[in-house]
Amino acid sequence: MSKDPGRILIFDTTLRDGEQSPGASLNLEEKLAIAHQLARLGVDVIEAGFPFASPGDFKAVNKISNDVGKENGPIICGLARASKGDIKACYEAVSPAPKKRIHTFIATSDIHLKHKLKKSRKDVLQIVPEMVNYAKTLVEDIEFSCEDASRSDPDFLYEVIQLAISAGATTINIPDTVGFTTPSEFGKLISDINKNVPNIDEAVISVHGHNDLGLAVANFLEAVKNGARQLECTINGIGERAGNASLEELVMALHVRKSFFNSFFKRNPDSPTPLTAIRTEEITKTSRLVSNLTGMTVQPNKAIVGANAFAHESGIHQDGVLKNRLTYEIIDAKTVGLSDNKISLGKLSGRSAVRARLEEMGYDLSREDLNDAFARFKDLADRKREITDRDLEAIVSEQVQLPEAKFQLCLVQVSCGNASKPTATITLLNTADNTEDTAVSVGTGPVDAVCEALNKLAKVPNELIEFSVKSVTEGIDALGEVTIRIRRDNKIYSGHSADTDVVVAAANAYVNALNRLVFSEKKNSIHPQFDNLENSNKTFLSNPAN
């Protein structure tokens, strides 16, 4: 019986593979905010995390399963290595979701078997059916991945896939784990799997790929032509190393070139039926949310969601667009949720008006979060005459982004000029013992002085590796968004903040980054690809939900 869904399923792994980007560590509230937005976006599957990694990861997957998992919503999925410890933890984490999936995997390439797993092909042929079968006793929906499939021996790969399907796998994922393959090679690999695995019709073929050679999206589209029906991707293409295949690029390629791809689904070229279930008008908002919460700025020239994606500098191009946008634009900006509309909110606007506008924009805030957001709105309205949707997005994103706060900024005072040394006075609250302390520092500029003072107070050794600031909207009174990235022990942590005063924004962003660093070191998680299987057969936690 064919498992072909008749369209493309979008499997979002922003919260799992995307979070493995250096500096992109997210707290529980941030993960929930992104998961809710992914559900509004219309993804079919949310890979919420790797539950066995740490108690924090388990709790996040469990909370998303409980709060975002709905009968009419996305499947909530957790990752598990091919071992009982991982699979059991994964099942317990996703169990509250009405639609749940266990995604288990093992490497199939000889280089991974020899150097990472220290196992033989014979070992893998024994492990795969045993672990898939075990997972099947817990949930019906099982995805199995052949890690590093693109560098695996094809005949061995076919054998592993056949065993996984026979044991109960309903989705077979073919990863290009190191971004090694080219479109023609990847398309042929999917085609050959269809031809050489006798029971392949009993499972959906999925693909997962990294962008090390800049070919991930092209590889996926070639895979679609050859029978892949699930695409594993991330918002803004974030992920380890050069990132993953970009969700927005894949979705819009299938949207804009639907007449081309329809034939691969046995449809009439002019069929109006969408190839995905994505609500494209939610793309821009989702991109900005992920960018703000992870601290990973989207490059200006990035397709679909970059600041310049719909900008025209050339006079010839500008003239053509003014006469007819189709002359130089293949996508209407409104299709991905871009709008120049401004809202008439100001300092006289009340809580109800702000709440109503946020609800129209798709934000569902708790009473406490709404009160905090409204307080920030009123503070901004006293300094800025006209409040735009982008201003509200910045306010809400920062509100959600606040990590577990060991440190809270109480005072920022800076003096600088061309005839004086930049000097910063900072007061910081340490919530661990509820004490305030003040420090004064000089620096090469006001931001450097602020960071030096904060380092004196926090006493958390780190290296500042990136500082960036951009304007949220136009005008002299615009909010300035600051992103700061710091490094400690080869790990990167990001902080983000927005304020009409960029020095205050920089101070808040630096404190956020410090709080992330402290929170991450408490978390003590493991990586699914770099820890051996033996570790996962140990007892996970006596009470993993705590």
Curated annotation (Swiss-Prot):
| Enzymatic class | transferase
A GO biological process this protein is involved in?
L-leucine biosynthetic process
Pfam family membership, one: LeuA_dimer
**GO MF annotation, one:** acetyl-CoA C-acetyltransferase activity
Question: Where does the protein end up?
Answer: Cytoplasm
Q: Which UniProt keywords apply?
A: Amino-acid biosynthesis, Branched-chain amino acid biosynthesis, Cytoplasm, Leucine biosynthesis, Manganese, Metal-binding, Transferase
> What's its catalytic activity?
3-methyl-2-oxobutanoate + acetyl-CoA + H2O = (2S)-2-isopropylmalate + CoA + H(+)
| Residue ranges of every copy of the Pyruvate carboxyltransferase domain listed in the record | 8-271
GO cellular component terms, semicolon-separated: cytoplasm
Q: In which pathway does it act?
A: Amino-acid biosynthesis; L-leucine biosynthesis; L-leucine from 3-methyl-2-oxobutanoate: step 1/4
Q: Do the record's keywords include Amino-acid biosynthesis?
A: yes
> Where do the segments described as Regulatory domain lie?
408-546
Q: Which Gene3D superfamilies match?
A: 1.10.238.260, 3.30.160.270, Aldolase class I
Enzyme Commission numbers on file: 2.3.3.13
Annotated family: Belongs to the alpha-IPM synthase/homocitrate synthase family. LeuA type 1 subfamily.
What HAMAP family does this protein map onto? LeuA_type1
Main function:
Catalyzes the condensation of the acetyl group of acetyl-CoA with 3-methyl-2-oxobutanoate (2-ketoisovalerate) to form 3-carboxy-3-hydroxy-4-methylpentanoate (2-isopropylmalate).
Record text on subunit structure and interactions = Homodimer.
NCBIfam families attached to this UniProt entry: leuA_bact, PRK00915.1-3
Q: What is this protein called?
A: 2-isopropylmalate synthase
Upper lineage is: Bacteria, Bacillati, Cyanobacteriota, Cyanophyceae, Synechococcales
